[in-house]
């Protein structure tokens, strides 16, 4: 999902939340933002971390419960334990963001990783676009509402801060539990010589 499209989704959510917080009808670009747009925007915003976390769970399950399959592909992890989970999580995060980076401890040039990363890339790119086009279509069907005293201004510093808070809460906290647990476990693990 490209930055512009993600930002569009987060603006829809921020407009809706801000409008409800101050008791005004949520409007964006002269169109009312209602529950249908909000539901689609929420699904789109949560789809990205959902795909990443589900595929990380699948790869972890396969690594633990099907070691014969992992060994037939040459093994995946050079760093066992929780750092290996971090490597798997980062691999799928990198694929979903389409940036191509990764931890080097993960042996990811195998059929399993190539196929699953390709699936993550497709799901993370094209499914959100469907939702964003649906939101645009719903907004296009609505009548234009002229700006009034009750219209929430979207070009102010306050709205910018609200948008930042929404992005932080939804995007950053989606991965907070797994990152917090991995960090705590890394700290508590005894140091191993590599």
Where are these regions (language model features)?
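Single conserved hydrophobic/aromatic residue that forms the stacking wall/gate
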Residues: 1-3, 185-194
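Final/C-terminal transmembrane alpha-helix of multipass membrane proteins
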Residues: 159-178
């Amino acid at each position: 999902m490209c930055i512009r499209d993600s930002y569009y989704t987060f603006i829809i959510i921020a407009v809706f939340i801000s409008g409800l917080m101050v008791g005004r009808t949520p409007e964006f670009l002269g169109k009312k933002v209602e529950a249908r747009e909000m539901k689609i925007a929420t699904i789109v915003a949560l789809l990205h971390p959902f795909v990443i976390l589900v595929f990380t769970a699948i790869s972890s399950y396969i690594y633990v419960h099907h070691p014969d399959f992992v060994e037939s592909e040459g093994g995946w992890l050079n760093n066992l334990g929780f750092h290996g989970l971090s490597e798997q999580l980062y691999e799928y995060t990198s694929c979903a963001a389409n940036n191509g980076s990764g931890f080097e401890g993960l042996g990811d040039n195998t059929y399993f990783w190539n196929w699953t990363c390709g699936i993550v890339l497709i799901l993370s790119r094209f499914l959100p676009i469907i939702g964003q086009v649906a939101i645009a279509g719903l907004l296009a069907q609505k009548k234009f509402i002229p700006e009034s005293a009750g219209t929430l201004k979207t070009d102010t510093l306050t709205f910018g801060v609200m948008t930042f808070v929404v992005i932080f809460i939804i995007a950053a906290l989606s991965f907070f539990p797994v990152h917090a647990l991995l960090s705590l476990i890394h700290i508590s693990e005894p140091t191993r010589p590599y």
